Amino acid sequence: MPTPITTATVQPLQSLPSAEEVIGHWDWSPALGTLHEWIQSQGIHASQVVVLVPFAQMMSQATAAWGQAFPTSFVPRFETTRNWAGAAGGPAIQADDLTLDVAHDSVVAAAMLASVKIRGLDAHWRRTLAPQLVETAHELATLVASVHPDARSDWLAERLAVLNLGSGDGFQRWESLIGTMALTWAANSQYPTDVLWHPVLHPSVAALAAIPGLADDPLTSALLAHWPNVKRLPPLAVRTAENGSPNPARLLAADDAQTEAQMAAARVIAHLQAGRVPVGI
């Protein structure tokens, strides 16, 4: 019996998105206008300026917005800290470094706990404490990465001074142990973004600027305080597709946590369906 021939419907080619669709629902004018004036006042070539943005999706949006606003100008490098570090080539990660990969870090945490010899720390407690060690270390990673690598030893010593290893009774004893181990692990690890702390490694970058996000990013703030030539730009405002004006804030009341979660999910879905991305939660 001959094999039946399957057919597929050929979809027509879609047109390329317009500049407005690429730029998204952000009002880039204040931030990019300030950036353009600052670059000119500094006498810097625009292509030698790295501009940190909060989300990876904003890199292409910022580039499109700059091209629309300043079509005859060279374009700055719009990057996230992670993307910039990846392009620069970060340090080689060691086997026991904190990587924020749960599978890898769980193995390291189990090995760390296995090496600790404290009365009462048996196999059961090691299995119980390993996930907590990983979670605590992950919570510290963002903060530690915002500390200059050369200053992390002093940073660690200051924080260990307020912890008394093995103090207290019951679970407080294990909390102290986990806190000490997580601090030590996080502070002694290398991070991909560590390469950003050394301007000498970036000869093509003459200046650093940043557009703030919904919340302060510790690493971005620390880099702006460390690099010699920097500029903090105004935050972005959200605009509607209809009139380009910022969306007014809305406050919704919920009777309980379940209703609150459902309302929040509905609002996020509505924003995504309207093409407003990314959505900050």
Which positions does each model-derived feature cover?
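Conserved RecA-like helicase ATPase core segment
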Residues: 140, 203-257, 266-270
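Beta-sheet entry/capping signal
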Residues: 48-50, 75-77, 205-209, 230-231, ...
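Helicase P-loop NTPase motor core
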Residues: 2-51, 55-56, 241-281
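Alpha-helical scaffold elements adjacent to nucleotide-binding pockets in ATP/GTP-utilizing enzyme cores
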Residues: 61-65, 87, 222-226, 263, ...
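Short amphipathic alpha-helical segments and helix-helix/interface helices
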Residues: 36, 40, 197-200, 220-225
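Short, surface-exposed basic-aromatic patches at helix termini and helix-loop junctions that form
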Residues: 65-72, 225-229, 273
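Basic/charged alpha-beta structural segments of nucleotide/phosphate-handling enzymes
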Residues: 2-11, 53-203, 218
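Conserved beta-strand termini and adjacent loop/short-helix elements that scaffold enzyme active sites
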Residues: 23-26, 79-84, 235-238, 254
